[in-house]
Amino acid sequence: ATASEYHYIDYAIHASIFTQQQIDEMNFCKDKGITSFKIYMNLGGEVGHVYMDMPPNSSSLVASKVNVTDELVEQIVKNAAQLGCPVLVHAEDYESCGCGIKKAKEKNQDGLSAWSSSRSPEFEAKAIKTVCKFGRDYDCVIYFVHIGSEQALLQIQEEKKLGTKIFVETCPHYLTLSYEKQNGYLAKVMPPIR
């Protein structure tokens, strides 16, 4: 309400949830006007490094290791459903991604083609299947952000047929770019361009 006096554009803030403590703070967030929560299923294990939690009066982010396990995802979805909030999802299975990246490094593969093959569309579909089951179990709306593959879309269609409440979006780079036609790492994103 206070921000409406100073801004000309409608906006909303969602909270990213990585830890049990943050799950415990979801009610507080909702009370403060945050009405959606985001999870990063691509973060955990060997690929669990993230910058987060900028301390008050600081301009530096804190580096942290997180593990967004299936159990954590289920708790987040359950809490969000009880609060009547959607869950925004970065859908990639972190364990599969970690294995894919390790294999690419062992083979000395590099570049965008290695990045794409190490984070297979199957890993995206696997995460979609996991979170959608929880969405159905707890009657929670699932909002997939930046879907990056046909296989992910096909899995989403299957999950919708099973009754999952789903919204989907993508980004222009998934519609217009391919790793074969890019140089360097300017198009290195997650999920990767195909």
Enumerate the language-model features and the residues they cover.
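Histidine/acidic residue-rich metal-binding segments in metalloenzymes
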Residues: 21-39, 43-194
